From Swiss-Prot:
Residue span of region Disordered: 1-21, 103-145
InterPro entries: HSP70_C_sf (IPR029048), Hsp_70_fam (IPR013126)
Keyword Transferase: no
Biological process according to GO: endoplasmic reticulum unfolded protein response
Superkingdom, taxonomy of origin: Eukaryota
Entry annotated with the keyword Phosphoprotein: no
GO CC terms of this entry: endoplasmic reticulum chaperone complex
Entry keyword set: Allergen, ATP-binding, Nucleotide-binding
Protein name according to UniProt: Allergen MAG29
PANTHER family noted in UniProt: CHAPERONE PROTEIN DNAK, HSC70CB, ISOFORM G-RELATED
Compositionally biased region (Gly residues): 104-137
GO molecular function, one term: ATP-dependent protein folding chaperone
Length: 145
């Protein structure tokens, strides 16, 4: 019985540390995923023709900088990963938002297929798109059983 109580206390004492580690890893994965998502978005043919070479280079340079930082700082704290993501979003979001608005919103106006996988930055992991509600001015489509 004493062993069980001791193990429960040990588990409780490690819980906070485990939670911090989980949050740190989630922030790292979020940053890495966003960086690769931006890179993939810019490689799509439908997007390539709509982004200026200057804007494309600006995003890709920042993505490469972030990926190099990730390689060198794999054990960084959650706040550092979140800061890097915000910096990356501050470069990407204005360009992608402008592109999205030029396309006429959610897949309309010459943007075949829209943004595959959804609009970058709206994966629910924070940040979101700079520029307000994005393409929410159009009709709402609800799934019916």
């Amino acid at each position: 019985k004493d062993d069980i109580e001791r193990m429960v206390k040990e588990a409780e004492s490690y819980k906070e540390e485990d939670d911090k580690q989980r949050d740190r890893i989630a922030a790292k994965n979020s940053l890495e995923g966003y960086a690769f998502q931006m890179k993939a978005t810019l490689d799509e043919e439908a997007i390539k023709s709509k982004v200026s070479e200057e804007d494309r280079k600006k995003i890709l340079d920042k993505v490469d900088e972030v990926l190099k930082w990730l390689d060198a700082n794999a054990l960084a704290e959650k706040d550092e990963f979140e800061h890097q993501r915000k910096e990356l979003e501050s470069v990407c979001n204005p360009i992608i938002t402008k592109l999205y608005q030029q396309a006429g919103g959610a897949g309309a106006g010459g943007m075949p297929g829209g943004f595959p996988g959804g609009f970058p930055g709206t994966d629910g992991s924070g940040g979101g798109a700079a520029g307000g509600d994005g393409g929410k001015s159009g009709p709402t489509i609800e799934e019916v059983d």
